[in-house]
């Protein structure tokens, strides 16, 4: 894996994305290729549902890669989704660096949006995990703030879409994939489930208005040297009890397999 190869593959797949989804399409993939190559001890990829565009993005393809890496340059984080992705990814990377899990309370300074109860890691040289990971959307076209799960699943069932997604995974070559888009079949396919060890972890999240039992599934494929975690979408945490248990569960799972990478 080298820079020239990653740039060429990303550019090639960008053209496939533009052909498959017309108009306002999100060109996603690796956040920052130089950073991705610099820190390849554990390569992390998040699978989300679909992008939500600002008015300036309508009508033409745009770089989703810039969108999520720019979140680290803003004052605080621009969205709950990217903030939570950053914190969990940072925790997984620290497992590899330190050889042990960083507890939620020992993370770098956490700040809050004004009027927002969701925690967000403040930006510093140490805490720029969005530069070091990849983020992919199941559907590359603009969606609503609340996705239609049936539409997302139907998108995955299109052969052309699945081909593009797996071409992206092939060149990104992640070791830890977090499927956070309600498409369980994607997690099974990525893990090549018949060749994988399979486990689950259940937790009851207690939100302000309801309790919800969330089952996190995870697969480890020794042949691919790949951990696939099927988890809740990070932006949903305000409904079911907050970030700490989500962070703890996902990072604990990753830490159990980190010695393989």
Predicted features along the sequence, with ranges:
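Surface-exposed cleft-lining segments at the edges of enzyme active sites
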Residues: 67-76, 139-158
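Short, contiguous, well-structured surface segments enriched in hydrophobic/aromatic residues
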Residues: 83-86, 91, 126-139, 143
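Proline-aspartate-enriched helix->loop->beta-strand connector
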Residues: 165-183
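Short mixed-charge
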Residues: 93-129, 196-223
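Beta-strand-turn-beta hairpins that frame and shape the catalytic cleft
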Residues: 40-44, 127-133, 219-229
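Active-site and ligand/interface coordination hotspots across diverse enzymes
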Residues: 1-99, 119-121, 164, 168, ...
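C-terminal capping/extension of enzyme domains
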Residues: 1-11, 15-22, 149-166, 185-261
């Amino acid at each position: 894996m080298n820079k020239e190869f990653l740039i060429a593959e990303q550019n090639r797949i960008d053209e496939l994305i533009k052909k498959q989804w017309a108009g306002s399409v999100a060109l996603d993939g690796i956040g920052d290729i130089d950073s991705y190559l610099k820190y390849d001890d554990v390569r992390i990829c998040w699978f989300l549902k679909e992008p939500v565009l600002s008015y300036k993005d309508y009508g033409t393809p745009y770089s989703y890669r810039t969108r999520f890496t720019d979140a680290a340059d803003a004052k605080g984080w621009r969205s709950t989704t990217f903030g939570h992705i950053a914190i969990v990814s940072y925790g997984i990377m620290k497992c590899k660096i330190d050889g042990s899990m960083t507890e939620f309370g020992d993370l770098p300074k956490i700040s809050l949006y004004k009027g927002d109860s969701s925690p967000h890691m403040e930006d510093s040289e140490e805490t720029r995990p969005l530069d070091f990971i990849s983020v992919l959307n199941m559907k590359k076209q603009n969606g609503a703030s609340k996705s239609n799960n049936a539409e997302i699943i139907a998108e995955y069932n299109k052969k052309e879409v699945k081909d593009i997604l797996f071409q992206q995974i092939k060149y990104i070559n992640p070791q830890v994939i977090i499927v956070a888009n309600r498409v369980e079949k994607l997690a099974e396919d990525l893990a090549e489930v018949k060749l994988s060890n399979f486990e689950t972890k259940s937790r009851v999240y207690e939100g302000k208005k309801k309790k919800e039992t969330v089952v996190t599934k995870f697969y480890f494929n020794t042949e691919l040297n790949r951990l696939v975690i099927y988890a809740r979408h990070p932006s949903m945490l305000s409904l079911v009890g907050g970030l700490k248990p989500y962070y703890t569960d996902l990072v604990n799972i990753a830490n159990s397999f980190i010695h393989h990478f």
